[in-house]
Design a protein with these regions (language model features):
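HIT superfamily nucleotide-processing domains
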Residues: 1-88
């Protein structure tokens, strides 16, 4: 960790385990934080794209039992196949 330069975590103050336990106001504030985080990352790192992710439940890869969201800046050629991560 971090996955790439500029990798950012958004973590709400109130403890909730997953996105689905957050109330509407918290979810709205998280989306606003995504926009602010994206702007800051773009100014500092100039990425070519982004992965934005929330893991919900152990089967989905959640290892920390507190809601958090990853904003991962991606750069051309940083991984062989950027489409591979969440496919079934």
């Amino acid at each position: 960790y971090p996955v790439s330069p500029g990798h950012l975590l958004i973590v709400p103050k109130r403890h909730v385990a997953t996105w689905f336990e957050a109330n509407e106001e918290e979810q709205r504030e998280i989306w606003q934080a995504i926009e602010k985080g994206k702007e800051a990352i773009c100014q500092l790192y100039q990425p070519d794209g982004f992965n934005i992710g929330i893991n919900v439940g152990e089967a989905a890869g959640q290892t920390v039992p507190h809601l958090h969201l990853h904003i991962i800046p991606r750069y051309q050629g940083d991984v062989p196949d950027p489409r591979g991560g969440v496919r079934y």
